[in-house]
């Protein structure tokens, strides 16, 4: 049981379950609960890949900063085991998403988002273009579910998802700004600092709210299968 909890912590359980829950709600609205459960599971597998690869890559830096809330640092989980689990999971996650209810097109789009998350872990978090992968990945999630039901995702859905993704990126980094700079992590939030990041978050949220208030939400998220 402790081992299972450690794997869950290494997957960044909160964000992972949030994305999984969103995928279930979207799939339930656009399709029905049967495939929605399967879609949520396949999405969950993709989020595990992102979270686990992040903790594997960050292991040395987490040790340096004594982040004992991380299971690899606290000793609850060995890095060899987490690395092995990540590589074992990879083909299953790819196959499940491509051959599951998302279909080839929807599955490929979602896996693009997963790829963006992994690319952030290994490359983009050091670059000024760090928000780009969040912009793409958070749009890929709803887009994949729309494609699964043979519908094109509305532009306003993609826009709000992307902007929320970027806002989350800036918000998520705030608590670790000093440690990140010490570790030479130079994404855009680390470069502009806390005050500017907060301003950017506020602007993005205002734009998102404005778009939502002027969008046909109820008619968009209606299933054709009922």
Which sequence ranges carry the predicted segments?
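Multi-pass alpha-helical membrane architecture of UbiA-family
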Residues: 1-226
């Amino acid at each position: 049981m402790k081992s299972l909890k450690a794997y869950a912590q290494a997957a960044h359980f909160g964000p992972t379950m949030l994305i999984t829950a969103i995928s279930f709600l979207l799939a339930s609205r656009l399709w029905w609960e049967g495939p929605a459960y399967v879609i949520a599971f396949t999405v969950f597998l993709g989020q595990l890949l992102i979270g686990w690869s992040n903790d594997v890559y960050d292991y040395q830096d987490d040790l340096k900063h004594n982040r004992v809330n991380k299971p690899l640092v606290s000793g609850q989980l060995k890095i060899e085991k987490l690395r092995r689990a990540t590589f074992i999971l990879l083909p299953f996650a790819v196959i499940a998403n491509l051959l599951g209810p998302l279909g080839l097109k929807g599955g490929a789009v979602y896996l693009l988002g997963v790829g963006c998350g992994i690319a952030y872990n290994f490359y983009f978090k050091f670059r000024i273009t760090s928000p780009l992968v969040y912009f793409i990945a958070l749009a890929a999630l709803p887009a994949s579910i729309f494609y699964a039901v043979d519908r094109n995702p509305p532009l306003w859905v993609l826009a709000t998802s992307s902007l929320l993704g970027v806002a989350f990126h800036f918000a998520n980094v705030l608590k670790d700004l000093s440690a990140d700079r010490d570790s030479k992590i130079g994404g855009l939030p680390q470069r502009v600092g806390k005050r500017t990041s907060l301003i950017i978050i506020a602007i993005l949220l205002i734009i998102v709210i404005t778009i939502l208030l002027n969008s046909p939400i109820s008619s968009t998220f209606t299933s054709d299968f009922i």
